[in-house]
């Protein structure tokens, strides 16, 4: 609130946020931003949208995200596909970076086709002022994501979200049973569970490699007062045996001299 004033152009927040928590005040945040004339930009993990509210429902003006969870390999950080969406408002659409493709029909109406739309934004018309200058070609990844989404459908996306919630909540249950301080942060979460250990999170992460486990994220890298807190991520592919292997490894590491 103290940093939000009439000079604020936009406010960006993520849901779930960096600590893996689901923001529960999204409506209030959006309302306060709009009351000051600021745009609301929301970063999302698209795999969550099968079970969480879409940003449009709480007033997001712009939504961004990474398409990697939608059927793409991590590829050590890239290349991947970005997601960029706005409200259906001409003022936003005309300022979007990249090319816009719209669906249409053939002249006789028998076939569906796709073409560039709002071409007054394009380089062959606006030259150096074209907003489509700001783009890269990620068509191959966009195609893979389209196939993934078409294969999954709304029900499939919902089921994946539910499976991730189930896996992460099972992991939380096991952390508690093994007497770890978890969750370290209070609040609802999606697929990431915060855990405090006796050893530093950096040491935990390093030693887990010996057990063929990558994780969790040492939050001490970002926050000085969280040197013993890790963020463990769980997805739809993790099994109960995977989670048990993690518990076994953590107990051995914590008990080692």
Where are the language model's segments positioned?
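Hydrophobic alpha-helical scaffolding
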Residues: 16-22, 41-42, 53, 68-72, ...
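Active-site C-terminal subdomain of aminotransferase-like
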Residues: 70-178, 183-186
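Structured alpha-helical segments in the cores of large, soluble enzyme domains
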Residues: 1-3, 17-19, 29, 33, ...
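A short linear-motif detector with a strong N-terminal bias
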Residues: 41-43, 61-65, 112-113, 120-121, ...
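Conserved C-terminal alpha-helix-loop-beta "cap" of PLP-dependent enzymes
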Residues: 155-245
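Conserved PLP-enzyme active-site core in the AAT-like
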Residues: 1-113, 179-180, 202-208, 220, ...
């Amino acid at each position: 609130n103290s940093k939000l004033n009439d000079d604020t152009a936009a406010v960006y927040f993520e849901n779930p946020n960096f600590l893996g928590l689901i923001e529960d005040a999204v409506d209030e945040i959006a309302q306060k931003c709009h009351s000051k004339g600021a745009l609301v930009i929301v970063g999302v993990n698209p795999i969550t949208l099968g079970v969480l509210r879409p940003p449009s429902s709480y007033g997001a003006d712009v939504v961004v995200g990474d398409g990697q969870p939608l059927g793409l390999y991590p590829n050590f950080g890239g290349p991947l596909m970005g997601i960029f969406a706005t409200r259906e408002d001409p003022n936003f659409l005309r300022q979007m970076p990249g090319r816009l493709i719209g669906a249409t029909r053939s002249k006789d109406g028998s076939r569906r086709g796709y073409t560039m739309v709002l071409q007054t934004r394009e380089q062959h018309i606006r030259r150096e002022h074209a907003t489509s200058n700001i783009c890269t070609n990620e068509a191959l990844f966009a195609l893979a994501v389209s196939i993934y989404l078409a294969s999954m459908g709304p029900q499939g996306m919902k089921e994946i979200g539910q499976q991730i919630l189930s896996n992460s909540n099972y992991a939380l249950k096991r952390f508690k049973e093994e007497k770890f301080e978890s969750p370290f942060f209070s609040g609802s979460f999606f697929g990431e569970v915060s855990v405090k250990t006796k050893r530093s999170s950096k040491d935990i992460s390093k030693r887990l490699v010996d057990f063929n486990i990558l994780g969790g994220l040492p939050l001490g890298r970002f926050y000085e007062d969280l040197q013993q807190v890790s963020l463990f991520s769980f997805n739809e592919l993790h099994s109960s045996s995977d989670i048990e292997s993690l518990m076994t490894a953590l107990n051995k590491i914590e008990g080692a001299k």
